[in-house]
């Protein structure tokens, strides 16, 4: 098994605590409201496993994440994608480490480290990461637009 890591930073005018609440703490409720392709998000067991189900006809049926850390004091979350169509037969898991920090005039910088844990001797291609990052940024931009349009939400 190999590991390929990528880092990324994104800035936004949204305060870090608001963005963390929206993207991490209340994502089970907010994401299905904002993204019609997401049917629902189910918590399993003690809540450390989250299953995101997609609507019928979507190219992705579901994704399952294991939540390792949600630190609302330091605005950090760590989780891994452990099941789902995205992993295919080449990936064991994908780990995410996100930190939300104050930046600029009340805004935020979101710093992420993504680690792809591959099966066997498979080497991840940059294009595969770029596609996943593109989809993640689409979600980020949708939530950002919602928070900008609704300044009292998660305030």
From Swiss-Prot:
Keywords: Pathogenesis-related protein, Plant defense
GO terms under cellular component: cytoplasm; nucleus
InterPro entries given in the database record: Bet_v_I/MLP, Bet_v_I_allergen, Plant_def-hormone_signal, START-like_dom_sf
GO MF annotation, one: abscisic acid binding
GO annotation terms (biological process): abscisic acid-activated signaling pathway; defense response
Any matching Pfam family: Bet_v_1
Highest taxon above the source species: Eukaryota
Protein name (record): Pathogenesis-related protein STH-2
Organism the protein comes from: Solanum tuberosum
